[in-house]
Amino acid sequence: MKKRMLVIAAAVAATTMMMTSPVMAEDFKVGICNYVDDASLNQIVDNVQSRLEELGKEKGVTFDVSYDNCNADASVMEQIISDFQADKVDLMVGVATPVAMRMQSATEGSDTPVVFSAVSDPVGSGLVDSLDAPGANVTGTSDHLDT
């Protein structure tokens, strides 16, 4: 269920990105940063990449995906996100809370959308205003289990 929600969020962000472009671009740059090498987090990355590929074929566009893993190193994460900004990516995807928070901070005041996943408390971490209306340029899925 969580994976499906992330894929839906990425698809919505990608579709919105395509629809809001003044001229329909054929190529979109997407930067994905994973926090650590972990089976469940890697699966999220794989699912996002697969869905972007499907969506690209469906819409006749290309998603040029740059993927990196910061291995829980804050300075490496900073460099990856700086590289995404220098490359002028159209969409950033942050996998895990620290990456999502840094992407949010890096894109504040810009039009670059951020999609996050594997974030337990998006509201408490300040990523979104609420789960129903995220606000700003950040949206995504939570891995919180309400047990």
Q: Can you annotate each of these PLM segments?
A:
Residues T15-M17, M103:
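Residues in and immediately flanking transmembrane alpha helices
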Residues A11-A13, V23:
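Cleavable N-terminal signal peptides
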Residues K2, A13-A14:
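Terminal low-complexity, poorly structured segments
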Residues K2-I8, A25-T147:
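Short hydrophobic alpha-helices and adjacent helix-cap/hinge residues
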